[in-house]
């Protein structure tokens, strides 16, 4: 149950990102695709560990 708030917050962050980058990129800007890849990887990790969260040694954010 402690995993659910983290999962919901990440979903809200992903939903609030713009689908089109309206500003010009500079060499220091991180691409939006990279941000989405990181978010997808985090969500996949949460999905994989969600089933084992009730067990103490398996859930790493307790």
Swiss-Prot record:
Its main location: secreted. Keywords: Disulfide bond, Secreted, Signal, Toxin. Pfam families: Chi-conotoxin. Expressed by the venom duct. GO terms for molecular function: toxin activity. Contains 2 disulfide bonds that can be either 'C1-C3, C2-C4' or 'C1-C4, C2-C3', since these disulfide connectivities have been observed for conotoxins with cysteine framework V (for examples, see AC P0DQQ7 and AC P81755). Residues 1-22 form the signal peptide. GO terms for cellular component: extracellular region. InterPro entries: T-conotoxin (IPR031565). It is found in: Secreted. Residues 23-50 form a propeptide. Belongs to the conotoxin T superfamily. The cysteine framework is V (CC-CC). This is Conotoxin Pu5.3. It comes from Conus pulicarius (Flea-bitten cone).
